[in-house]
């Protein structure tokens, strides 16, 4: 099958959508499909060129703009001709995805079978998307809609008003994230909490530092430490919060790290924390769960796809409960051990084999809907 991946963001940029689209493309190629990526993100060849990256043809359709903005209203000129001969298009939508949206118009006018994956929780944008009516028309005219979690799919179902919206989750290489020799017992009296996120307001890194300060106050003997891995526009605000709370000796902000380093940091930690309320999926949390860490997050976020409360982590209704749950893990090593044992012996449902099969089913659904 010839599959066109259509996405605003792609490698070498690093983020949830970028990495997931690249990994899914590679897995599909390994199963015998032909995949090409169309994106606004520049690569080694710059803008307006085509390159082969990890065996996949990548068409770079962006233009050079200040602050590396990924906007090009002319990107879809000629796209229809480029998409001729493909069997299906797979559009990847984020909170703001002008290119992906333009691609929706192109593929619908072509009659090209199309599936659209929503990688975001619409939240306040739901009313605007509903009022525009475009997504509903796409779905009702045969575009196969899905989202990365049931949390992300729920507002989309209200918007499309009838056509089914399925779940196509993010995938993970379970073997790659499993510890090869079990988890080390550090035994130094320190409880290490870790999080990996973009330092953006939507991810709530400031609230995480504030919550952990309350955990330290509630469990002064636990030796609580916090490490937040990632970069973003909120770094300065997070650093000011650390200074205000006098937390420099127990909070570290190493920045963005590669996957191998992330695995090492998880191996040296005890608990993963995901404070975001608007988390559509939470791939970093899933990686930590596969690595054996108990995962603590908020009810109503995407991590509920792979975290069961009081089984392999905790799901809190609000920040006060989040503090209580984190405190429980800080002072009760037996609870941490129980959850870690479960996570190490129980594979999640989001392994790549299952996810690729689900993607293929979506492509078949799109082709059937297109007639």
Task: Enumerate the predicted regions with their spans.
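Short alpha-helical donor nucleotide-sugar binding micro-motif in glycosyltransferases
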Residues: 83, 256-257, 264-269
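Carbohydrate-associated surface elements
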Residues: 151, 171
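Conserved donor-binding/catalytic core segment of Leloir-type glycosyltransferases
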Residues: 185-212, 227
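Nucleotide-activated donor-binding/catalytic signature segment of Leloir-type glycosyltransferases, i.e.
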Residues: 239-257
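Aromatic "clamp/platform" in nucleotide-sugar-dependent glycosyltransferases that forms part
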Residues: 277
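Short hydrophobic beta-strand element within catalytic cores of glycosyltransferases
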Residues: 294-297
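Conserved acidic donor-binding segment of nucleotide-sugar-dependent glycosyltransferases
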Residues: 309-320, 328-334
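A short, well-ordered alpha-helix in the C-terminal region of glycosyltransferases
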Residues: 335-349
